[in-house]
Amino acid sequence: MLDIKVIRENLDWSKKKLATRGIKPEELDKLVAIDKERREALTKSEQLKQKRNEVSDQIAQAKRNKEDASDAIKTMREVGKEIKDLDKEVEDLTQKQKYILLRLPNFPADSDPIGPDESYNEEVRKWNEPTKFDFEPKPHWEIGTELNILDWDTAAKVSGARFVYYKGAGALLERAVSNFFLDENTKDGYTEVIPPYLVNDASMQGTGQFPKFTEDVYTIVDNDDPDKPRDLTLIPTAEVPLVNYFRGKILDAKQLPINVTAFSPAFRSEAGSAGRDTRGLIRMHEFRKVEMVKIVDEDSSWDELEKLTHNAEHLLQKLGLPYHVVALSTGDASFTSAKTYDLEVWMPAQDKYREISSCSNCTDFQARRSLIRYRDENGKLHLAHTLNGSGLAVGRTVAAILENYQNEDGTVNVPEALQPYMHGMKVITKEPKFGE
């Protein structure tokens, strides 16, 4: 959430910044007008409360002197009613202000490419040249099906579209990737966490998913009343429970930075994705991901973003997967992010790079919503800065391995870094069928 004081005192700057993220200037004019009205009502209420105290003293003095205090008592009642009405007005205006603030995205960093969509993203660097073959490479969904290690058809019967079964070496590969990521992240100084996979609405609001993106997630409903949502949602990313672990806490600056990592399932409705990536592992309703989160002080978050991005890059380099890093434009960056680097891995069958990790600096945006603070050496409180990044998306990594390490005979070589996690397996061959 943005700081209303920053918007109030830098209105033109705020309009210019948020215009690059699709926010109309009238929205900020409306917000500032509500804020002005709220502050005026609050000031008047405080003045009346002071007057009430003075009248109360007058009544007490009159009673001590055995004087008539009826006029003062009448005034006291009138002032009390005014205060009650004003406090109700302040509360209503506060809620209107909060409604708008919760739906405004973060201010973009000055270094962000300006543009309305992904076509304005800028390549920052590239690692290794795209994989080339002397045969026509197959897409990962064909490879997985032919090797009998991925099964979308049965998953469609059991669950619906955008679900998959991993089998045999496919399941082993997915588990190997997950464990490899966690081991590498912990070597890089992250503490492993196993978080809850169901979170409440306050947590979803704290990291910025609610109230703007309620259609993108799966919320649990009451068994007795399907139209009544329970206060529980399946996590769209482990970022939600990891960041909210610190919600409402005051940290010691000496503890920072705090680095945590978690492997978890992620559940997404993919609202608005109809017709996109209908085949394969790229866009699923349920997938697994290793997440990295940093809680840092306000002065180091930009350096920490570079470290976070390099942590994610390190994983792709160890796996030998070609990729490039792109800086997202103001119109393509996520709602909570001030700056995002996307890591996009090369997919030979698609002949293009596809996103496999987003590394973002959310500055104090999530911390203000979640009230995550730290106390400096002088005892002063500051809002922390939060960062998050995929380290990495597991299913997309499996897809990239199948496509980049495929052989002409349909088998797939296992990256050297994963062989110890796959009982020494060096080549994935066709699995025998079962249950058919």
From Swiss-Prot:
Entry EC number(s): 6.1.1.11
GO annotation terms (biological process): selenocysteine biosynthetic process; seryl-tRNA aminoacylation
Segments of skewed composition (Basic and acidic residues): 43-55
Chain positions recorded as ATP binding sites: 268-270, 355-358
Region entry Disordered, spans: 43-69
Enzyme class of the recorded protein, top EC level: ligase
Entries under InterPro entries matching the protein: aa-tRNA-synt_IIb (IPR002314), aa-tRNA-synth_II (IPR006195), aa-tRNA-synth_II/BPL/LPL (IPR045864), Ser-tRNA-ligase_type_1 (IPR002317), Ser-tRNA-synth_1_N (IPR015866), SerRS_1_N_sf (IPR042103), SerRS_core (IPR033729), tRNA-bd_arm (IPR010978)
Pathway annotation from the record: Aminoacyl-tRNA biosynthesis; selenocysteinyl-tRNA(Sec) biosynthesis; L-seryl-tRNA(Sec) from L-serine and tRNA(Sec): step 1/1
Keywords recorded for this protein, A-Z: Aminoacyl-tRNA synthetase, ATP-binding, Cytoplasm, Ligase, Nucleotide-binding, Protein biosynthesis
Binding positions (L-serine): 237-239, 291, 390
Subcellular location per the Swiss-Prot or TrEMBL entry: Cytoplasm
One MF term in the entry's GO annotations: serine-tRNA ligase activity
HAMAP family given in the database record: Ser_tRNA_synth_type1
Domain comment quoted from the record: Consists of two distinct domains, a catalytic core and a N-terminal extension that is involved in tRNA binding.
Record text on subunit structure and interactions: Homodimer. The tRNA molecule binds across the dimer.
Stated family: Belongs to the class-II aminoacyl-tRNA synthetase family. Type-1 seryl-tRNA synthetase subfamily.
Protein name: Serine--tRNA ligase
Gene coding for it: serS
